[in-house]
Amino acid sequence: DFEHNLLSNNELSKRLGTNFYNIALHTKGGVLLHPGKLVRAMVDVLPKNVCLYENSSLISWNKTKDIISCEFKNGKINTKKIIFATNGFLKSLGIKSNYNFPITLTASMTRPLTDDEFKTIGQPEEWGVLPVRPMGATIRMTKDKRILIRNTAEVHNPFKMKKSDLEIRSINQRIGIKKRFSQLPKDIIQSSWSGVVSRTRNSSQIFEKID
């Protein structure tokens, strides 16, 4: 069991710098992790018997007897065992075609708050808020005084989101920040991006042997 306790509005306001939330469940022992830095760090310590090929889209695959053949734009792999880790795109490989689908999420991060701006919200320590609802808003306060917010989730082609589409969605993030921190300027968002997560009907993971 995780050590945890309920926090009410007053204590939440002190910890988060906003009175937006009425009640929360605090679990101890969590960490805020930068996924990009984690991946880069893992790449740096890969063992010698592991090769990494980036930007190598899988075009097709098939299995003949006990050999799995995978075709790429600039090469081919033949192997007896393989793990397909495709997030929400199992269907594009003809695997479990009716079991999962990709959801596109959009997030934004502010520039570092100035010392004066940070004082207006009580100079809280870094924190992270996860929603009760699966697709509710996720908010972070980082060590370098940035606010990260993800409050959109939609079925959208993740490879065809134009800059104008991203800017429209970042408006939701700007509104979300303003609701929680009305004393901060409106133009503090520095970057926005989108990504994909896999969803299933019963919210469970798909990890099993194909054949």
Residues covered by each model-derived region:
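A structural preference for short, hydrophobic beta-strand core positions in alpha/beta folds
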Residues: 6, 52-54, 189-191
